[in-house]
């Protein structure tokens, strides 16, 4: 069953809140490529940004990953997370290994991964 995109964004926001981040979401409408802003009390400004895609039938490719890198650069954000219910193309994964952006999504066993660490 496919997860509705807004519900998925809310689940992702709650996950980051439970793992110690202060979260801020955008109002409905154009989000500029960012679904959740992550903040740390000890760090001024936005510490990381999150883009969510509830795509089970599509793989996230290089284009949306590059776009998120562009937002990170334009907004001087040091870290990013791209979260999907589906998978990533090999080129998209390779691109994220070269920077501060992590691909997050389920592995073939249904476990969620953040970089090389699994979420249970």
Features from the language model and the residues they span:
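Mixed-charge (Asp/Glu-Lys/Arg
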Residues: 1-120
């Amino acid at each position: 069953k496919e997860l509705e995109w807004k519900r998925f964004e809310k689940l992702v926001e709650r996950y980051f809140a439970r793992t110690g981040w202060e979260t801020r979401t955008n109002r409905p409408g154009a989000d500029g490529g960012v679904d959740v802003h992550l903040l740390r009390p000890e760090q001024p400004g936005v510490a990381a940004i999150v883009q969510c895609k509830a795509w089970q039938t599509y793989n996230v490719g290089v284009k949306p990953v590059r776009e998120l890198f562009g937002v990170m650069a334009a907004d001087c954000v040091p870290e990013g997370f791209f979260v999907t219910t589906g998978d990533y193309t090999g080129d998209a994964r390779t691109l994220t290994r070269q920077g501060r952006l992590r691909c997050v999504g389920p592995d073939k066993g249904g476990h969620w991964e953040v970089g090389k660490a699994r979420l249970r």
